[in-house]
């Protein structure tokens, strides 16, 4: 059960309505999940949704790599809502379903594509270790460049905020199409 009472547009004050309208008129087109929680604090909602619009739609990464970083973060946080929204998007963007299923099991896929492997390893380490190993950082900088590495950190950080919000406030999933197993040990995701 969600920990905060949900709201309707009629419940919102003027500042909340402004932020609500910014979100609805932006790339998302709707207010769902963590945004519904954040809108209780419209100042946070405004800033977070702006960062989120960049993290989701504006980074230097291809969509498939962004979605890979997102689902890796969501998996480590055991965020079922996040997983169910982004696992299908990762596949649609070009990440093989077998890799997505391996990540769902909290295991490290061995990608055919070196860049996907680098992004996965970087995202997994940053979320699990709260840092990345020197060799992971070096190869990421060499193959991706600093802008894309910074964007991976931004995506992982933003989706950690999302996942924490979803978990802490017990935001329910709107679907149960892709169950996420309960796993507490993520060491098998590390190289």
Regions found by a protein language model. Name each.
Residues 1-191:
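Hydrophobic alpha-helical segments
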């Amino acid at each position: 059960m969600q920990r905060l009472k949900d709201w309707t547009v009629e419940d919102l004050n003027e500042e909340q309505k402004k932020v609500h309208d910014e979100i609805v008129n932006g790339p998302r087109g709707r207010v769902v999940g963590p945004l519904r929680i954040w809108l209780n604090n419209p100042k946070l909602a405004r800033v977070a949704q702006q960062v989120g619009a960049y993290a989701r739609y504006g980074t230097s990464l291809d969509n498939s790599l962004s979605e890979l970083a997102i689902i890796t973060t969501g998996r480590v946080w055991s965020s079922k809502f996040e997983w169910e929204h982004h696992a299908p998007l990762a596949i649609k963007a070009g990440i093989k379903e077998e890799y997505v299923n391996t990540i769902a099991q909290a295991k490290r896929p061995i990608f055919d594509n070196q860049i996907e492997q680098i992004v996965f390893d970087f995202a997994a380490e940053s979320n699990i270790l709260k840092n990345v190993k020197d060799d992971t950082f070096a190869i990421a900088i060499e193959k991706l460049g600093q802008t894309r590495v910074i964007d991976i950190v931004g995506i992982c950080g933003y989706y950690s905020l999302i996942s924490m919000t979803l978990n802490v406030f017990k935001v329910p999933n709107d679907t149960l199409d892709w169950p996420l197993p309960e796993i507490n040990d993520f060491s098998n995701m590390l190289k």
